[in-house]
Amino acid sequence: MMMVARVATAEHVGSAGASLPQTPGSRSFALGAHPGPQKRIGGPAQGQTAFITPLVTPDGIYSRPSSPYMQASPLLKGSESGGSAGSPQSPDAPSSASGASVGNAIGSGYTGNVSVAIRIKPSESSTKDPWYASNDRLIHTEFGEFQFDHVFTKGVCNQEVYQALGVPIIDKLFEGYNATIFAYGMTGSGKTFTMSGNKQEPGLIPQCVGNIFDRISSEHHGASLAYEVKVSYLEIYNEKIYDLLNYVDRQAGSTGQPSRNATGLKIRDDSKYGVKVVDLTEQLVSSHEDVMKWIATGDRNRKTGETDFNTRSSRSHAIVLLRLTRYDLKTGSEATSTLSLCDLAGSERAVTQIVRRKEGAFINKSLLALGTVIAKLSMLGSQANGLQPSPAAGHIPYRDSKLTRILQPALTGDSIITTICTIDSKAESSTETTNTVRFASRAKNIALNVRKNEMDSHAEKDTIIQNLRKQLDEQHETIVMLRRSAAAPSGNGSTSPLDSPGVGGTSLSERTHNMEKGLLEVENSILKTKLEHCEKLLDKDMMVLEDPHVREIVEMLPLDIASVLESKVQGMESQLRQYRVYVQKLESDLLKAQRNIITTHSVQFNRQSTANVQEKYGSDVDIELLLEEQEAELMELRNALKRKDKMIEALQSARRLRDSALSPTTTVLLQRKESVIDPRDPQPV
C-alpha cells in the first residue's frame, strides 16, 4: 500500500540583501496595507478550478464579472504573519516608504531595500490568464494590485532583463560591494532560462560574466590596477552540498553524474566571508570563455530530472560564485567582492515517484525555511519603517537549511541582492503563483545596510614602510662599502679608513675588533661572577658569628631558640658578605671598562683629530657608527652602576630591618641579665 501525501508547499521567501539604485524604467513602491477600502473577492472553493476572463487584451482592458465565490483572498493571509508586506495596495494610495528600494550610498555603506522583479512566463494556452502587468505593477482583480521594482511582461527578452537587473549589480560589484542575484519561482516558470538562457538568448549568468571581463579590459589600461577572478560552482541536493567543479568526485561510468557521498561539503563560519563552504573548488579564470567552460562542466554534473512541468528540471539549488579581487599596484592594497548567482529549485506538489517525492520534500523544506527567514526579516523591516512591531519577529532560523545558512551573510547586510521571481499566470498555477507573489512582497520589505569592501590604503603605514626600506638600503650599501674597504686596499696604494695605522701600528678595524672582544670578555666575566654568587647563596654559611654582642645574646638564650637565631643571623651575614664581594667586583669591572673606553678613544683619535679625519676621508660614517656603539656601551655600564647602587641600598635596608628585629630581644636579655644577683656583690643588711 503506497501512501501519497501532499508535501507542504512553501510560502517561499527569498534571500535578501540591499536593493539596487533606481534604473531607467524602474519604480519603487511601499507595500504597506492600503488605508482605504479594498475589494475582497475570494477565489474558487477548495478543489475547484476557476477559469477567469482575461483582464488585458490587445484591444484594451475588460472588466471581470463577479465571482460566485465570496471567500477571503489567500493573499490577505500575508498580513497576519508578514505585516503589510503581503497586502495589496491601491495605485493611488500614498507610499509610506516611497523609494525605499532605491539604495543610497552613505559613507562606505549602502542602504536600501531588496530589489524585487517579477517575470511572467509566456503562455501558449488558450485559457484566459487572471494576472496581468501594467507599469511595474502586477494586477489581479480578486487579490488586488502589487507594485515592484520591475515587472517583465511576456514579450521581454533576457537582454532587457539583464539591462534592468544585471548592469546595476555589476556596477556595485566593481565599487566593492558583494552582490547576489537569485531566481525564485515554481517549477517550470522559467528560472533556469532567466539565469542561464540558451545560445540564441543568453541569460543573466553569461551576460554578467561577459560584462565583468569587459570592465576589467577597459579598466586594465591604467597601470595602477590589476584584477583576479575565481569561479566556484556548488549545488544543494537533498540538503547536502556538492562541488560541481571537483573532478575527483566523479564516478567512473557513463552516467556523467558526480559521486554524492554521504556527508557532502561542510559549512563553517569565516571571518572574511561570513560563512565558507570547506574544500569548495575555486578555479582561477582569465576570460569569459574560461568561466563559461567551468559553468558548463558544472551544469553537466548538476542533478536534473523530469517532472510534470519540465522534461529537464533542476532538482537542486545551484549557486555560481565569482570572486573579484582588485589590486592597487601603487599602495599594495587589495579588496575582494563576490557575485553570487543562484538558481533555486522550484517548489512542486508531491508526485508518485519515490525519488521525485523525496527530492520535492527536501526542496520544499529548504524553500519553507527560506520563506520563514524572509518573513521574519520583513517584520524587522516593517519595524524599521515605523510600523507596529510584531512579536513573531524574534530569532531568525538561518540554520534550518543549507540554503539559508549559505545566504545568511547576504541576508544580514553583506550583499546587495536582487530577486527575480518567475510566475506562470495560468489559472492552473494559481496557488504557486500566489505563494511566489507573497514571497516577493515580503522580500521587498526587507531593509539592509550593506557594508562596502573598501581597499585599505594604509597611507601612513606605507610611508613608514618606504622610509624603513630606504634606511635599510642605505645601511646595506654602507655595510658593503665597509666590507670592501676592509678586505683589500684600493688600487692606488692608499689605505681605507679602517686600515689606517694608529697607535702601536694597528689598524682601526683591528682595534675595533679588539675592543669588541674585550667587551665580550668583560660581559662573560660578569655573568660568571653572577653565577658564582648565586651558587654561594645556595650554600649555608657556617662561619662563626662575628658580632660579639650577638654571640653573647645567643649564649644566654635557650638552646632551641639560640640555634634558630644563630642560623638566621649567619645566613644574613653570609648574604651581606656576598653582596659586598659582588659590589666590589662590579665596581672593579666598571672601572676597567671605563679605562678601556678612555684608552680606546685616545688610541683612535690620538694622532689625528676628528676634523683631520673628515678632511682626509670625507664624511666618515664608520667612525660615527663606532662612536654610537661606544656611547651605547657606556650607557649600559652606567645602568649597571645604577643597579649596583640600588643593590647597596637594598642591603642597607635589610641590615636596618635586621637591627630593628633584634633590638627588642637585646633589651629583654640585658634587663634579665641585670636582674641576676652577682654573689660577689655585698648583700644588703
Curated annotation (Swiss-Prot):
Residue numbers spanned by region Disordered: 11-46, 63-101, 485-510
A Pfam family: Kinesin
Residue ranges, compositional bias (Low complexity): 86-101
Record GO cellular component, one term: kinesin complex
Subcellular location: Cytoplasm, Cytoskeleton
Gene Ontology process terms (BP): cell division; microtubule polymerization; microtubule-based movement; negative regulation of microtubule depolymerization; nuclear migration along microtubule
Main location: cytoplasm
GO molecular function ontology, one term from the record: microtubule motor activity
Keywords: ATP-binding, Cell cycle, Cell division, Coiled coil, Cytoplasm, Cytoskeleton, Microtubule, Mitosis, Motor protein, Nucleotide-binding
Positions bound to ATP: 185-192
Domain Kinesin motor: 113-446
Coiled-coil residue spans: 464-486, 520-663
Record function comment: Required for assembly of the mitotic spindle.
Entry's family note: Belongs to the TRAFAC class myosin-kinesin ATPase superfamily. Kinesin family.
Protein name: Kinesin-like protein KIP2
Organism encoding this protein: Eremothecium gossypii (strain ATCC 10895 / CBS 109.51 / FGSC 9923 / NRRL Y-1056)
Gene designation per UniProt: KIP2
